[in-house]
């Protein structure tokens, strides 16, 4: 950090911001007229906000979106969701990929999922074919070949997960509804 204050004001954001790994860009979600985050923009530090690039727009009014980073700091994830359905897009740190995020899995009514990246794999937390959720994974270069890593367990809700050096930490709730 060079301890400089950035005075580039960006209005009408949701407060959801993500710095690029190279510190050249700032990704943010912009609010629509109903005060819902529906668009993701890329702002290049040191440029005028009016030149920011729209990189994602959620067209379905039921859904809102946000952006975040992966645990291994190799990918960015745009998550869009409503109460029971979600969808994720991703891109890497290549500036050309910012403008065309890749769809991970097409949304399916009633299916929720989130994605992270660690150790050469995408890790998926989902309720697809798993009422109480499961954790699946696939290699970065083969997102069509997803396999269960921690399958659904009867009466155990598999919650979120995070990664530490060589460990995955997950939460589970017994006798979950």
Annotate each PLM feature:
Residues 1-177:
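Peripheral, non-catalytic segments that deliver or gate enzyme domains
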């Amino acid at each position: 950090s060079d301890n400089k204050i950035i005075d580039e004001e960006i209005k009408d954001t949701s407060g959801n911001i993500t710095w690029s790994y190279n510190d050249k860009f700032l990704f943010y979600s912009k609010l629509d007229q109903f005060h819902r985050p529906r668009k993701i923009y890329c702002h290049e530090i040191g440029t005028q906000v009016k030149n920011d690039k729209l990189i994602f727009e959620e067209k379905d009014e039921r859904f809102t979106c946000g952006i975040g980073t992966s645990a291994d700091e190799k990918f960015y994830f745009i998550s869009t969701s409503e109460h029971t359905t979600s969808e994720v897009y991703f891109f890497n740190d290549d500036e050309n990929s910012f403008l065309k995020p890749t769809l991970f899995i097409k949304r399916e009514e009633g299916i929720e999922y989130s994605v992270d990246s660690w150790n050469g794999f995408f890790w998926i937390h989902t309720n697809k074919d798993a009422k109480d959720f499961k954790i699946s994974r696939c290699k970065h270069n083969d997102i069509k070949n997803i396999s269960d890593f921690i399958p659904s367990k009867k009466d155990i809700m598999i919650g979120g997960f995070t990664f530490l050096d060589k460990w995955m930490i997950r939460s589970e709730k017994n006798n979950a509804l």
